Regions:
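N-terminal cap/leader regions of alpha/beta-hydrolase-fold enzymes
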Residues: 1-277
Length: 277
């Protein structure tokens, strides 16, 4: 895949875009590729060029990418002010539980239905999903959908006001843990060591709740890209976005190693259109 300018809006011209209605709720979804389905959930403040780049990496690894528009301006490099406005709107949206621990965001119901639909459309063993930042925990809740097999949590940030809190109801968390044990599945998690939004306390809470079913990876702060878009420079003043804004797109970088581990995880659980027979 040729490198694009991450400082320019991404036209997303290589994705098929459509409206998908599930449970009476309609959202725009960008789809590309072939093979088993992987749902990529954007970080705040929306589908940036870096989020789209990650989706293309997943596509090129042999998967069908489903990238739902959950907030923000699709493909944009937003100003700090625009990004802050998107963040504030999402915090009070009925779809998200930004401040409350022990609750699951209502939008995860729609995302679980999307996983079920994607499995029907793409076939294969099941579906993978990755959430980032504001959506970071969503892939865990999506494990309540039987089609989901490969959840990845990248810098899960919610709830915002409880560093050790988990954005999932206790009953759903217990159900997910039971499924992980029964089916011998795991959850991958990623954060930077000095991330103030996704803390060590949160990863400790995941480990306590999920045991060795949670595989947490912590990257050194020195592995983070320091050249970021205005929103991140102003409002995210620490290493945070492992696979997008703070990823360094050079061979041998720890963030690239994290990307490759995730792609291998998807192939292990789902197979791919590039897997040998």
């Amino acid at each position: 895949m040729s490198k694009r300018n991450m400082n320019e809006d991404d036209r997303l011209e290589d994705f098929a875009v459509g409206q998908i209605t599930l449970g009476g709720v309609t959202k725009t979804v960008y789809v590309a590729g072939s093979g088993p389905a992987v749902i990529v959930m954007t970080e705040m403040p929306g589908i940036s060029p870096q989020v789209a780049r990650f989706s293309r990496w997943v596509r090129d690894a042999g998967f069908t990418v489903y990238m739902p528009s959950l907030f923000g301006r699709d493909g944009a490099v937003p100003s700090a002010e625009e990004g802050a406005a998107v963040f504030q709107k999402a915090c009070v949206s009925a779809e998200f539980r930004a401040l409350a621990a022990n609750q699951s965001s209502p939008v995860t119901q729609w995302l679980r239905a999307l996983a079920r639909l994607a499995h029907q459309q793409c076939g294969g063993q099941g579906v993978g999903a990755i959430g980032m930042c504001f959506t970071g925990n969503f892939a865990l809740t999506m494990m309540l959908e039987p089609a989901m097999l490969a959840p990845v949590l990248s810098q899960p940030t919610l709830p915002l006001n409880d560093p050790a809190g988990l954005e999932v109801s206790p009953g759903e968390l217990a159900a997910v843990r039971g499924r992980l044990d029964r089916e011998d599945l795991t959850v991958l998690g990623y954060r930077f060591e000095g991330d103030r939004f996704c803390t060590a306390q949160r990863f400790a809470a995941y480990s306590e709740a999920l045991g060795d079913r949670f595989v947490g990876r912590v990257l050194l702060d020195s592995a983070a890209n320091t050249q970021t878009a205005p929103f991140f420079s102003r409002y995210v003043a620490c290493p945070h976005s492992v696979l997008t804004a703070h990823l360094i797109d050079d061979a041998g970088e720890p963030t690239i190693a994290a990307r490759d581990e995730i792609l291998s995880f998807f192939k292990l659980r789902l197979g791919s259109s590039t897997s040998p027979p």
